Amino acid sequence: MKKLSLIWISLLAVFTFVGCSDDNEVEYNQSSDVTVAVPEVTASTGTSLTVASSVTGNTGSIVRRGFCYSANSQAPTVNDNMVEADENFSATISGLMGNTTYYIRAFVYGNSRYTYSDALEATTESQPIDEQLANYVAPAYEDNYTSIADWTNRSRWNLSNVHDPSVVLAEDGYYYMYQTDASYGNAHMAGGHFHGRRSKNLVDWEYLGGTMKNLPDWVVPKLNEIRKEMGLEPTTADEADFGYWAPCVRKVRNGLYRMYYSIVCPGTLSGDGTWSERAFIGLMENSNPANNDGWEDKGYVITNASDRGLDFYVNASADDYWNENCYYKWNAIDPSYIIDNDGRHYMAYGSWHSGIALVELDEATGKVKAELPDPWGTDADIAAYGQLIATRQMGNRWQGSEGPELIYHDGYYYLFLAYDALEVPYNTRVVRSTNIAGPYVGMDGTDVTTVGGEAFPILTHPYKFNGNDGWVGISHCCVFDDGEGNWYFASQGRFPVDVPGINASNFIMMGQVRCIRWTEDGWPVVMPERYGAVPQVEITESELIGNWENIDLSYAYGEQKTSATMTLAADHTVTAGDWEGATWTYDSSKRILTLDNGVELYLQRETDWEASPRTHTIVYAGYGDDYKTYWGKKSK
């Protein structure tokens, strides 16, 4: 469990914020001596709403008045978005998205407290898509969120402090996101586990809080039950040292949502000279994720399994320490839950160790369908703990692959994999199969199920465009769709190590959502720039002429891939860059740019996050006939 132990220690080593409390003085309506009227809309456009309110009571104490608004939070505060009101208690809220509903509250401040009105729901007018693009306002939140990283600022986090996200689209139209317990400065430790947030537009996210208050009651008894059967003493681990990792949330049907989660037990099996303690995967259910306190724990699902009997002692002088000493065959973290085309329920899981395993689940209970024997013995003894569906090297017990994400699309099951260490080198691969149990095969024909090998293509990799520090650690993804044919890739991105002026910069972890497009051959490509709700106006051929920042996303362990200039000329030739001398054609109906050297690029309008101020741009992602991945962005 290299991933788990090293990162948990590292996170605890980062400086800890002090003074985190709930005394966030933005929500005071109790016993107020003023009454604020619900706002009214006096004018609206596709990008703005003009609103007015009034206040009665002890108005002499009021020193400030205004309006706060949000597309997500139904009770926005001044920690969301806010505009000051004029002397008539009126204001224009600008920079809004067209045909979008906002929640708006009027507020006043006096006597050291805020008083709010009830919320108004107001919708901006629809705009022609060309006008939407012309009026586009990019997301304003800062990637360097250190100034708001502490617990008292959690209502302002948006996508700050996110790691290993899992996203589900619920019946109420919200996307709900849940995550590993990790944050800059360990701010999350003030508020439970498996923290949630939600969004209507995948850009603005409302923080909801922890879904689990304490270590589940079943964990320590189950751990001690297994330890007793192994001939070991009960655990003496401190509850504060357990890890809470990598939830997977899915909608099973209307009124039923399941969250599979990982609990990592601290310590070793029997002191120095023995292997690490095990992990568990458990299950929670909820009928409505809008009720963040409604997650009911359903208990134990599965644990680590070893094919080495009770031989958990390590040889410190082993030539290949991790591979030779690794006690477990399967590591019970990083669950991914799927219902296949025949209505059968499965869970893929695994991190490092021998690779990724698949088990069938009982539809009614969500637990493993087969009866689970003791989690140690021979390979045959532990067969119920899963079958291998992906490995980087057959027989290697310590390989950098984890975070499986299993989805179905257009005739194939796609298995997304996180490769290498998560701090910097993390990168994402994908393989596919027509059968949920495999064999899973990469774009280059490598069978990672029955033979083993490196999975291709690469979907994400450490990178940077010009004028920016870029991102590393971009993996452990969730893949989801909006029900209307649009697919998304959510993961964390981390700042590189030692960014000047930022303490512990690599512990800045930002939730990131990117668009997925599917190639003509059915492979996913992930856009390089993060999703920012840019209107998808047709991309014309004339817009492609000029310079691009092109990134060759070929694998290089721990290296941030940088961009080089690539120029498309009006005569359909490439006049600069690695593809100089090639010719190109463009299919505007499919938004596909094809070069005669075998490269096929899929275009999309996205936010230019590196620009100042941020704006919209055109990006691409695609593959060459050598299975290389390319990312690019149009230069301004």
Region roles according to the model:
Residues 6-11:
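Sec-dependent N-terminal signal peptides
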Residues 23-25, 126-636:
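Carbohydrate-active catalytic/glycan-binding domains of CAZyme proteins
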Residues 1-5:
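Positively charged n-region of N-terminal signal peptides that target proteins for export
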Residues 22-127:
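Short, surface-exposed linear motifs at loops/turns and structural transition points
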Residues 16-19:
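C-terminal motif of bacterial Sec signal peptides marking the signal peptidase cleavage site
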Residues 12-14, 426:
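N-terminal leader/targeting segments
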